[in-house]
A protein has these predicted regions:
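Active-site anion-handling motifs in enzyme catalytic cores
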Residues: 1-130
């Protein structure tokens, strides 16, 4: 999958942090990553929020919906797709090569989400005041 063996073996699985302030350890661990990939919703949400390139692995609809809603549907792969492993391998390599570009795309997506939230808040506030 990886032509460079250093890349192949420089992979870590996030530990299970527990207890008070464990979220700090969790986010510190994530911030050291070049790429996050997983099927868990929070793995993907946190990666996007931290501007860490993600590859979502769809095993249930909620994850695909996240990527569709924010316009990043190409960053989520369906594990049941016939050529999943080839596509996943290609996406891993491409993501590592395009890290900076993907981070910039995430920043734009988050800015748009904030603008959308602000517009909805104004509409809600107007509706409630009637």
């Amino acid at each position: 999958v990886f032509p460079d063996l250093n890349i192949k073996y420089n992979i870590e699985i996030a530990p299970y942090f527990t207890g008070q302030d464990s979220e700090k350890e969790f986010f510190n661990f994530y911030e050291k990553c070049d790429l996050l990939t997983g099927m868990r919703f929070h793995t993907n949400v946190c990666g996007i929020a931290l501007n860490i390139p993600t590859i979502g692995i769809k095993t249930y609809q909620k994850l695909e919906d996240l990527y569709l809603e924010i316009g990043l549907e190409e960053r989520c792969l369906d594990v049941n797709q016939e050529n999943f492993f080839e596509q996943y391998s290609k996406e891993l390599q491409d993501t590592l090569l395009r890290k900076k570009e993907i981070k910039e795309e995430y920043i734009k997506v988050k800015k748009k989400l904030i603008q959308d939230k602000d517009k909805k808040y104004i509409l809600l506030k107007e509706w409630l005041s009637k």
